[in-house]
Amino acid sequence: LKSRVLIVGAGGLGSPIAIYLAASGIGKIGIIDKDNVEISNLNRQIIFTSSDIKKNKSSIAINKLRKINPDLKLQSFNKKLTAKNINQIAKNFDLIVDGSDNFRTRFLINDYCLEKKKILISGAISKFDGQVYTFNFSKKKSPCLRCFISHTPTNLDVDNCEYEGVLGTLGGIIGSIQANEVAKEILGIGDTLCGHILVIDALK
């Protein structure tokens, strides 16, 4: 495959997304994450081990993916995604997969993909709940994240996992579904979640 996929966040969602996409033979994967690995991440960020603590997530993740698929083109961005740098970073990617953990970044990615008519596959996890959204902005009637979230959260930078906690396995469930949505969009097969919200309650 020659598709180019940018993963925003190498955390609980980004980890399984990156692993499955690398193994599937995606042409190029970019990962952006400015954070370092912490011991509290290890219950859900399965691409990392205890030997990676205090090291940059995006750089370590890229090294792990290279071992899975040495033919894969990889690019690491050790920085925070902002309105000033998003076009420079994302313009050469076909699909954006949002694994971020705050609304400010989610809205930034949503608005950029809407403007540039890119495909966006967004996921979110908190406590025992997870959601997946697919937006194909090349289609005229595709909704966007703001269509589903009518009221802007008071704290756009809130990190749900940090303050509320999250079931470790939930990241794997939602991240795998996001990776599956990427595959369906690239291959043009099956029914995607475009226009829908998939909600997972891990306690049911």
Label each region the model flagged.
Residues 1-204:
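Adenine nucleotide-associated cytosolic modules
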